[in-house]
């Protein structure tokens, strides 16, 4: 498998090639794209990973609050809305060690990169 292989790009390339090869035959064409991202394994092309590097270093609680504030400023949600608390089974950010925080931030970066890459490929 090529070093830069990413399933969403491969599926999209294959679908585009099939559409192009059937474009002129005048027959109906059905396509079903069943992407596997953003499920395990968590991986994404480097360009997408680079885009999210450091974005989640503040932790999930702080990011949730920033997103809520931005939505309130845009009048998307009520000004009295509050960030939902983290479920008890999930550790609070400030209770994690620095290495655990770094790992969680990295997982969120990769997940965001996968969703972004998937969205890009669907748009092609």
PLM features per residue range, with description:
Residues 1-124:
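Active-site-proximal cap/lid insertion segments
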């Amino acid at each position: 498998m090529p070093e830069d292989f990413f399933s969403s790009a491969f599926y999209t390339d294959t679908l585009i090639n099939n559409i192009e090869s059937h474009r002129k035959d005048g027959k109906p064409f059905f396509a079903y794209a069943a992407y596997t991202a953003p499920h395990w394994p968590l991986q994404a092309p480097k360009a997408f990973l680079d885009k999210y590097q450091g974005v989640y270093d503040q932790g999930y609680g702080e990011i949730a609050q920033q997103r809520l504030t931005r939505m309130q400023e845009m009048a998307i949600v009520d000004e009295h809305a509050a960030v939902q608390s983290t479920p008890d089974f999930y550790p609070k950010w400030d209770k994690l060690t620095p290495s655990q925080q770094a790992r969680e931030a990295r997982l969120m970066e990769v997940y965001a990169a996968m969703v972004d890459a998937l969205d890009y490929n669907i748009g092609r």
